[in-house]
Amino acid sequence: MIRIALIVAVAAAALHAEGTKCDRACLQGFVDSYLDAMAGHDASKLPVAPSVRFTENGKEMKLGEGFWRTAGKSSYRLYALDPAAGDAGAQAVVSEHGEPAIFFVRLKVKDQKITEAETLVCRKGHAGFFAPEKMTTAPAIFSEKVPDAQQSARSQLIRDASAYFTAVQTEGTPDYKEAPLAPEANRFENGLQTTNVPMMGQPAMSASAQLDKGLFKGLLIDHRRFPVVDVEHGVVIGLVMMHANMNGQKNTILISEMFKVVGAKIRQVQAVMVNVGADAATGWK
């Protein structure tokens, strides 16, 4: 009798776990629901945990405040989905008072409830690069599955993305460490292509060549986090705080970078970034 009861209990637990698991379609649905609810200025439409945490540009707020009060519909969505961790991230272009804003959201889902919502909002004039008009169609490469032979383990994908940030921070110094970039790799910052095109008075260079030359020398990167990792598609989201000293003026930038990795080489980087105050925080550990 005890054995039967134990079997029933185990089966019930398994069914409960299966019922609360959020697969790729489920996670994307949460992202879409978030963007749609935000466009309607009604956070009550979202299934959230009582202890849900929400930040906007590093500041903790009550869900429904900030951009929620002014955001309109989105015209572009690029997803990164991590069923293993229950995390999802997306980049979007969102209308605000008739003007486009570039938006990033990361959600953590547990037991079919949103427990964390981390967002970045970049408006015109709040970043060095701002080209939402170029963000019309999500790049197909991020939705392509990586062949089994070229897939990397979760830990390796994180190392590859972190190595990129190390290269950016050490470029132009004796401690420079190369990033695992594919020869054809491209980087886009707030919609603008910043590799293989003339930049900062320099001729067109590959992503690797820019770093080798130390084109962005003097950047400090901290608070690295990699909460979203999609092994099947080779996609990693890295979140960092970057400190720059350009022409004697200090600037702090919150950045979300979405990496596409194939065969242990980064093939594309899509970044959303926004300038914040010198005393800013990420809002997350």
Each language-model region and where it sits:
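C-terminal and inter-domain tail/linker signature
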Residues: 16-285
